[in-house]
Amino acid sequence: MPLLDSFTVDHTIMKAPAVRVAKTMKTPHGDEITVFDLRFCVPNKEVMPEKGIHTLEHLFAGFMRDHLNGDGVEIIDISPMGCRTGFYMSLIGTPDEQRVADAWKAAMADVLKVTDQRKIPELNEYQCGTYHMHSLEEAQSIAKDILDRDVRINHNEELALPKEKLTELHI
C-alpha cells in the first residue's frame, strides 16, 4: 500500500490549532488543487466530541466558503478527519496559509453567532445521515477554543518524519 502524505509528518510535534498544506497537485487541465490540514486539536492529546465535530461539519463548510471563496479560490470539500483532531479542506487554487487561517477564524466567529440548533444547515433525516447526532453547544465550544488559542501555521519541513524513522516503523 502506498504511503499517504498525511502519514509522513510527525504527529508528536504537530501544533494546534494550525493550518498546513497537506498536498498540492495539478489536474490534467492545469487547475491547481490544494489540500489543507486544518488541525483543531493536538494529535493524541485532544479530540473533538462527536456531536460537536458533526455540527461543525455542517456549519464550517458554508462559513469557510463565505470567507475564502473568490480571487482564484473555490472550496471543493471540507471533511472531518477520522481521528477527530481536524478537517481536511480541498480546494481549487493556492491561497497562502495565512489567508486560510484568517478565513478559519472568521468562520469560527460565525459559528458563535448561530443562535439555535434549528439553524444548523441540512439538519434533517433527508440531508444528514445521523441527524440526531448534533450539538450546537459543543460546536460553539470548539469554535471558542480555536479563537482563544489562535491559529498558527504548521510547516511540512518542520514536521517531516526522517527516513530512518519511517524505516523503523516498517513503512
Swiss-Prot record:
Any Pfam family the entry gives: LuxS
Catalytic activity: S-(5-deoxy-D-ribos-5-yl)-L-homocysteine = (S)-4,5-dihydroxypentane-2,3-dione + L-homocysteine
The protein's required cofactors: Fe cation
One biological process term in Gene Ontology: L-methionine salvage from S-adenosylmethionine
Superkingdom in the source lineage: Bacteria
Protein residues bound to Fe cation: H54, H58, C128
Enzyme class: lyase
Enzyme Commission number(s) from the entry: 4.4.1.21
UniProt KW keywords: Autoinducer synthesis, Iron, Lyase, Metal-binding, Quorum sensing
Similarity section: Belongs to the LuxS family.
NCBIfam families given in the database record: PRK02260.1-2
Subunit (UniProt): Homodimer.
Name of protein: S-ribosylhomocysteine lyase
